[in-house]
Amino acid sequence: MVRFENIGFRYGLGPEILRDISFALAPGSLHFLTGSSDAGKSSLLKLIYLAAKPSRGLITLFGRDTATTPRRDLPALRRRVGVVFQEFRLLHHLSAFDNVALPLRVAGTRENDIRKHVAELLGWVGLANHMNARPTTLSGGQQQRVAIARAVIARPKLLLADEPTGNVDDRMALRLMHLFEELNKLGTTIVIATHNESLVKRLGLPCLRLDDGQLEIGASAPNRAAMAAASGAGGLAKPAVDAAAGRPRENAV
């Protein structure tokens, strides 16, 4: 799915902020990406998304060497990736509903199905009463949930989430993590960047840790029982992302 081999990355002519990064993400896996606020987590996600180029090394995405992939083919690769940026990048002239519906409309989904799935998902993230609101009228936490819903609505092959629980309370954080878990069960490979160590320890998922520009790979196994218990404690039902299920889950490692 994703492979980094001896990747280095710098901004401009500055020193490398990521050095000798090597790892592989198997299809269907779910990992935390942790480290301090200046560890380079966002930069690593941008490299995976092809929003930045490495200063050295090899990146393979969906089996393709990104350095030799023609520029005209890069947008098609990016469309297979859902991204939640810290900046949210919502379209302010569209409602929350239309922001979330956008990936489905681009994919040619029937309007009746769009209305059903978007309304269901916005309800799951606590925005049932804000579907017609413009992003500028929403709080930071509400905008973040719109961005998350937009990123997951089309069930991407790969989801990159940069601090997706940074603007919500603990209960909503667990609710969102349960949403990611259900998406992962449908086969989506997921990387969640966070500096919330308590959340990482509570859920016990495999962990990629950045420290001083270098990567450490945690050996802990996925703790699905902890995830289910944490979600169940809040009386949560299965999230709406499962509504259009049909793709079997690939084995995670």
Regions found by a protein language model. Give the residues of each.
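ABC ATPase NBD coupling module
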Residues: 66-82, 111, 183-185
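Short coil-to-helix segment of the ABC ATPase nucleotide-binding domain corresponding to the Q-loop/switch region
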Residues: 94-102
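Catalytic Walker B motif of ABC-type/P-loop ATPase nucleotide-binding domains
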Residues: 159-162
